[in-house]
Amino acid sequence: MKTLYSLRRFYPVETLFNGTLALAGRDQETTGFAWWAGNARLINLSGKLLGAHVAHAGLIVFWAGAMNLFEVAHFVPEKPMYEQGFILLPHLATLGWGVGPGGEVIDTFPYFVSGVLHLISSAVLGFGGIYHALLGPETLEESFPFFGYVWKDRNKMTTILGIHLILLGIGAFLLVFKALSFGGVYDTWAPGGGDVRKITNLTLSPSVLFGYLLKSPFGGEGWIVSVDDLEDIIGGHVWLGSICILGGIWHILTKPFAWARRALVWSGEAYLSYSLGALSVFGFIACCFVWFNNTAYPSEFYGPTGPEASQAQAFTFLVRDQRLGANVGSAQGPTGLGKYLMRSPTGEVIFGGETMRFWDLRAPWLEPLRGPNGLDLSRLKKDIQPWQERRSAEYMTHAPLGSLNSVGGVATEINAVNYVSPRSWLATSHFVLGFFLFVGHLWHAGRARAAAAGFEKGIDRDFEPVLSMTPLN
């Protein structure tokens, strides 16, 4: 068996099937990895690895385009998006495409265009992936040195990191330009129940924006998830885009410092573990963001948050009973606390009953009824608008608590609709994926560190139990 430099620590298992899997430099004999180890076979074949990554991007973009068109084909304008199981159209609507006042969809053509553009892009990526996987050079170092690399080349690795950071920064600025110049984005806080608007007065104050990072993650603080106006969100993207681009330029122009060279493991598997760790953190943050935040993820498209649906129920019954003559300011509930209104731990007037635990909810249909000391009794008696009643009644029956068999809403709510909120799907999927990515991070980090330390030798084949067993054939 040829012993390559990369094979020093591999002791491949011989199986009955090895002879049939000669894949020209991608078989177990020459790489130390069996076919099921996926891209591990391509660790030293930069051209083939490029093909795998481009083809993977093609699959992702194809799914986005096809699913986008599937949702457009199934779209019913009479029902809210969140009642139709959509997970892509809400994102397009949040960007201001195809929607008008109150989040009403007035034109589905932009959604169709988005789907078609993604399908066309996926065809280009798919062709590129197949080309590089089957026809292109196996390694890029000789023919295209700019695109070639050696995993241990620290300077080249930080250059690649820098290019990635610049691309991420450009992505952040695309959102900024959309909000500033290209038609604006959907603002759930626009007066009268939300509308598309251009963001003109960006928040660029570092004390405000970086103050979010210093907040507690609990309760009414809510870390960065507590952001509740688009000026802060778009201004934050200006800062993030700038930091990413400047950091990218920095990493392209500089070499890693001595402390970084010593502290980090410099191998392909180590970079994989770093990436998985970062994606895991993104997944957990996205989970919290989509579950709690109704500014970046407007309730008109994603359905109400859990606290929002609960507060909407309290509001709906306050409106009903007030019309029937109840004195909502003083009525007592079964525990002796206020039935409709009570005071929070810090003295604000809040909704009473079980929803008291969600007293720090902020929602655009409720904020106009607050005064300096919480809910304003005179506004509750005189200023409630029909759109606020309609929206809270809708949200009350669409709590994001559905189970997988589509029994939506609160179990005791007889008016609930059979549906699973996209908020539930997006939060749950990002939590689960974030968890698995974290496990993958630990796994690959452990392997990479062991390999770097020189004790990843595998099982001693001389004493392997299988050698004393009867052959399968």
Swiss-Prot record:
It is found in: Plastid, Chloroplast thylakoid membrane. Keywords: Acetylation, Chlorophyll, Chloroplast, Chromophore, Manganese, Membrane, Metal-binding, Phosphoprotein, Photosynthesis, Photosystem II, Plastid, Thylakoid, Transmembrane, Transmembrane helix. Binds multiple chlorophylls and provides some of the ligands for the Ca-4Mn-5O cluster of the oxygen-evolving complex. It may also provide a ligand for a Cl- that is required for oxygen evolution. PSII binds additional chlorophylls, carotenoids and specific lipids. Its main location: plastid. Gene3D superfamilies: photosystem ii from thermosynechococcus elongatus (1.10.10.670). [CaMn4O5] cluster binds at residue 367. GO terms for molecular function: chlorophyll binding; electron transporter, transferring electrons within the cyclic electron transport pathway of photosynthesis activity; metal ion binding. The chain crosses the membrane at residues 69-93, 134-155, 178-200, 255-275, 291-312, 447-471. GO terms for biological process: photosynthetic electron transport in photosystem II. The modification Phosphothreonine is found at residue 15. GO terms for cellular component: chloroplast thylakoid membrane; photosystem II. The modification N-acetylthreonine is found at residue 15. InterPro entries: PS_antenna-like, PS_II_antenna-like_sf, PSII_PsbC, PSII_PsbC_sf. SUPFAM superfamilies: Photosystem II antenna protein-like. It is a multi-pass membrane protein. PSII is composed of 1 copy each of membrane proteins PsbA, PsbB, PsbC, PsbD, PsbE, PsbF, PsbH, PsbI, PsbJ, PsbK, PsbL, PsbM, PsbT, PsbX, PsbY, PsbZ, Psb30/Ycf12, at least 3 peripheral proteins of the oxygen-evolving complex and a large number of cofactors. It forms dimeric complexes. One of the components of the core complex of photosystem II (PSII). It binds chlorophyll and helps catalyze the primary light-induced photochemical processes of PSII. PSII is a light-driven water:plastoquinone oxidoreductase, using light energy to abstract electrons from H(2)O, generating O(2) and a proton gradient subsequently used for ATP formation. This is Photosystem II CP43 reaction center protein.
